Curated annotation (Swiss-Prot):
GO terms for cellular component: cytosol. Its EC number is 2.7.1.2. Keywords: ATP-binding, Cytoplasm, Glycolysis, Kinase, Nucleotide-binding, Transferase. One of its GO terms (biological process) is glycolytic process. It comes from Escherichia fergusonii (strain ATCC 35469 / DSM 13698 / CCUG 18766 / IAM 14443 / JCM 21226 / LMG 7866 / NBRC 102419 / NCTC 12128 / CDC 0568-73). PANTHER family: GLUCOKINASE. This is Glucokinase. HAMAP family: Glucokinase.
Amino acid sequence: MTKYALVGDVGGTNARLALCDIASGEISQAKTYSGLDYPSLEAVIRVYLEEHNVEVQDGCIAIACPITGDWVAMTNHTWAFSIAEMKKNLGFSHLEIINDFTAVSMAIPMLKKEHLIQFGGAEPVEGKPIAVYGAGTGLGVAHLVHVDKRWVSLPGEGGHVDFAPNSEEEGIILEILRAEIGHVSAERVLSGPGLVNLYRAIVKADNRLPENLKPKDITERALADSCTDCRRALSLFCVIMGRFGGNLALTLGTFGGVYIAGGIVPRFLEFFKASGFRAAFEDKGRFKEYVHDIPVYLIVHDNPGLLGSGAHLRQTLGHIL
């Protein structure tokens, strides 16, 4: 008889829940709930389990916020809870709450070739560190290493490192944004809101007044080639994504590959392919050759957060991935 665990991927807007086959890691019965419709994460979980008429004893939920102890307070939502209390209330034997990019990193060993699109570099080196990052509402970052037959995710808040300009134009953008918001992190330019910041700074640098555009508007106008400023913003976004990925590669020697997740890049895949992304990734001066062969992959799996939550839980329960 198949034994299932509950897995989840929870963001500021939606909570996506599914079942994970503990033996194989296969994800099934995924369903998305609006976080605004429920008073707590526990309430959503109860609804899901009732709807699917299933009993589970183990669970792993990935959440888009730092996880530093028993008390979890979501960054972009009002939900807050004690992990131990929720585990007790649900009657679970085991409940893991992990960072969303910890989950994405743990999905990488489970991905198949059809889930990946490669952007330059050679083959990944087995056993070497891996980096994963992705732009969405924010900028998530994690690393993954293989130690004693176990995958170990190294979570952090790498999206909040300083934005480091490397051209005159990027320097001007930094100054404009710094005057507006103070500290300018990488997330302030590599995210949905970050794309808007780039567009606004490009227009303001030319002493013009920017329109009140959303990320979707900027992307659509850039792809339609109907707005020079939007196209420049999207081009610069791709270049800065490359610089940032190259920095991750240098920091931990990620010869196991650099992986891009998040919902933004797949929306303009052909544009991204033709952009200055890879050139910027390798633009490391004296260390250009060091990063030259490091492969970059775009993750195109539908639910890497769910897949990785399942992988994390299965490994915790003693399975070898």
